């Protein structure tokens, strides 16, 4: 019974700490996460559409066409 009370108090304390920390950090994130395709194209140098590629290496900004062996951009929606 005593152990159960200690565990309950510990869980409540940790929950309160997380809520306080979450309120303090709201709106302070400097770099918002980008979409994965945008992040990849901005973080690495990649080959533009029409360039020669191999399907085993991920060097295209979009994707490497399997049969033609050239880079193709992702379709824009």
UniProtKB/Swiss-Prot annotation:
Asked if the record carries the keyword Disulfide bond, the reply is yes
Localization in the cell = Secreted
Which keywords does the record carry? Disulfide bond, Knottin, Neurotoxin, Secreted, Signal, Toxin
Recorded hits in InterPro entries, A to Z, give: Conotoxin, Conotoxin_omega-typ_CS
Residue ranges spanning the membrane: these are: none
Signal peptide bounds: 1-22
The GO terms describing molecular function are: ion channel inhibitor activity; toxin activity
Pfam families xref list: Conotoxin
Where does tissue-level expression of this protein occur? Expressed by the venom duct.
Which cysteines pair up through disulfides? They are 46-61, 53-64, 60-71
Q: Which residues form the propeptide?
A: 23-42
Superkingdom of source:
Eukaryota
GO cellular component term of the entry, any: extracellular region
Q: Where's it mainly located?
A: secreted
The role this protein plays is: Omega-conotoxins act at presynaptic membranes, they bind and block voltage-gated calcium channels (Cav).
The family classification in the record reads: Belongs to the conotoxin O1 superfamily.
Q: Please, what other remarks does the record include?
A: Found in injectable (milked) (IV) venom.
The free-text domain note is:
The presence of a 'disulfide through disulfide knot' structurally defines this protein as a knottin.
Write the protein's name. Omega-conotoxin-like CnVIIJ
Q: Which organism encodes this protein?
A: Conus consors
